Regions:
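S-adenosylmethionine
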Residues: 18-145
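Conserved SAM-binding loop of SAM-dependent methyltransferases across substrates and taxa
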Residues: 7-20
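Conserved class I S-adenosyl-L-methionine
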Residues: 1-6
Length: 145
């Protein structure tokens, strides 16, 4: 699931590179979704779907991967998509420089397991990819103090 897909990044690219994946791009702007659907048709990407909806209203089965690029703060990204994440799924959010304040504002139960620095050719700006998942529940029988 690519949230706030806009022109289709990274959703269209993921669908093209991973034909075995089913990729859904969701955006609240109908023209952007129409563009993604046109790209899917022109490139014969049968594994790519565009959904015109606000993420809060999207009805869909759970996703193994939920992505965003320039959608919202990390908390505003994970909170409305949490119900759409598969039990073993992960979130991947592209951000500018390492978003320390956003990381600190994540809701309880969300674990950041990797922050990957990115280099974008032609850009001097810092970028990173933040990988998150639901924290593992405590094992039964363990005592926590």
């Amino acid at each position: 699931l690519d949230v706030g897909s806009g022109g289709g990044l990274p959703g269209v690219v993921l669908a093209a590179l991973e034909p075995g994946w089913s990729v859904t791009c969701v955006d609240s702007v109908g023209k952007k979704v129409a563009f993604i659907r046109q790209v899917a048709a022109e490139l014969s990407l049968r594994n790519l779907a565009g959904e015109h909806a606000r993420i809060e209203a999207l009805q869909a089965p759970p996703f193994d991967l939920i992505t965003s690029r320039a959608f919202a703060s990390l908390a505003d990204f994970v909170v409305p998509t949490r119900r759409l994440l598969a039990p073993t799924g992960v979130w991947a959010a592209m951000k500018g420089k390492s978003p320390e304040l956003e990381l600190a504002a994540l809701p309880p139960g969300i674990t950041v397991f990797h922050v990957e620095p990115l280099t974008v050719p032609g850009l001097q700006a810092e970028r990173c990819l933040v990988w998150m998942r639901e924290a593992a529940p405590p094992s039964p029988g363990l005592v926590h103090s």
